Amino acid sequence: VTVDDAIDVLQEEVTEDIEKMAAMLPGDKPYLKTGIFETWKARTPWLMLLMLSATFTGIILTHFEKSLMACAILTSFIPMLSGTGGNSGTQASTAVIRALSLGEVRFSDLFQVLWKEFWVSVCCGLCLAAANFVKMMLVDRWLLQNPTVTPQVALVVCATLVGTVLCAKLVGCSLPLLAKRIGFDPAVMASPFITTIVDALSLLIYFRFASAILGL
């Protein structure tokens, strides 16, 4: 086996992993040589599945529609919470998928991984919440003169931020291990579903805190 052959194999493996993590069926042709129909066929199944699974987010929003109407300012923070949760989950899943591929962790290490990510998420969540509270008070309330951004609203958002980061990292680190355990490719199983799961969880946490703190 020549060095060039080995490099070609490595490139193909890396490309396949990247495509899997982006919710695409792996292809064996260069991008410009892959036909439109082939590309469509590789991308549509996962997009369809993720679109259907994302309806849970819509159901949650519909269920708490009255809360949103009573405190409309809550709506403006949903993208930030969902984005932060998705990014947090992706960080954890990427680290675990890489560790699995290198043989650094196994399913038997699940609780050790969860314990580590729990404390990482607590530290990250508290740091993000503190920064966000300052931003909401100084920028949103004082600089932009938005009276609807009250300390109570900021508390709801920041508490949700901590809970979302915690759930996202625990989901992100456990899904690849569970996928490996049941015989699925961790990159295929974990990455596409993390954002969908975290979006739903973050909304549930958000509206529960809003109900408890704001009395909605």
Language-model regions, residue ranges each:
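Cytosolic regulatory modules rich in charged/polar residues
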Residues: V1-I78
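Short helix-perturbing small/polar motifs within transmembrane alpha-helices
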Residues: P26-G27, E38, L102, C124, ...
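Transmembrane helix-loop junctions at the membrane interface of multipass transporters and ion channels
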Residues: H63-A70, M136-Q145, P176-I182, F207-L216
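Membrane-interface alpha-helices at helix entry/exit sites of multi-pass transporters
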Residues: V105-W119
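Re-entrant/interfacial helical elements at transmembrane boundaries that shape
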Residues: S76-P79, T90-S101, P176-K180, S191-P192, ...
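Juxtamembrane helix-boundary/capping and inter-helix hinge elements in multi-pass membrane proteins
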Residues: A99-D109, R181-A187
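Membrane-water interface of transmembrane alpha-helices in multipass transporters/channels
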Residues: H63-I78, L144-V156, A187
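Alpha-helical transmembrane segments in multi-pass membrane proteins
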Residues: W46-A54, G58, F77, L81, ...
